[in-house]
Curated annotation (Swiss-Prot):
Domain of life the protein comes from: Bacteria
Protein's gene: rplL
Lineage: Bacteria, Pseudomonadati, Pseudomonadota, Gammaproteobacteria, Alteromonadales
GO biological process, one term: translation
Function: Forms part of the ribosomal stalk which helps the ribosome interact with GTP-bound translation factors. Is thus essential for accurate translation.
Transmembrane recorded as keyword: no
Keywords, comma-separated and alphabetical: Ribonucleoprotein, Ribosomal protein
The keyword Thylakoid appears for this protein: no
Self-association state and partner proteins as the record states: Homodimer. Part of the ribosomal stalk of the 50S ribosomal subunit. Forms a multimeric L10(L12)X complex, where L10 forms an elongated spine to which 2 to 4 L12 dimers bind in a sequential fashion. Binds GTP-bound translation factors.
GO-annotated cellular components: cytosolic large ribosomal subunit
Ranges in a coiled coil: none
Organism: Shewanella sediminis (strain HAW-EB3)
Protein name: Large ribosomal subunit protein bL12
GO molecular function: mRNA binding; structural constituent of ribosome
Length: 122
């Protein structure tokens, strides 16, 4: 009996963020590909599309001076365990959360910056 796409999707859905990152890196290495999104050159309509952005990514660029507070903030925001949150903080720059609303992104950015991290919203 072979493994179906649904079996794989269910297994990935149960993984932590750090496990998914490790899986992606292993797949990139095994198949010689990159998971980076292709950049498409936009014409005059590109500005209108950017103005209508509804999903945002929160990127932590540095954990700053107080790593412990940042790890606590990461755990609270993502639900990660201590080990995973520490690994995420130490692997900056890293996407903390992706495809979230502007309000969620702003709140997360505020929480992380109050803890001492450097954060960008993309």
């Amino acid at each position: 009996m072979s493994i179906t796409k649904d079996d794989i999707l269910n297994a990935v859905a149960e993984m932590s963020v750090m496990e998914v990152v490790a899986l992606i890196e292993a797949m990139e290495e095994k198949f010689g590909v990159s998971a980076a999104a292709a950049v498409v050159a936009g014409g005059a309509e590109g500005g209108a599309a950017a103005a209508e952005q509804t999903e945002f990514d929160v990127m932590m660029t540095s954990f700053g001076e107080n790593k412990v507070k940042v790890i606590k903030a990461l755990r609270g925001a993502t639900g990660l365990g201590l080990k995973e949150a520490k690994a995420m903080a130490e692997s900056a720059p890293v996407a903390v959360k992706e495809a979230i609303t502007k309000e969620e992104a702003e709140a997360l950015k505020t929480d992380l910056e109050e803890a001492g991290a450097s954060v960008e919203i993309k």
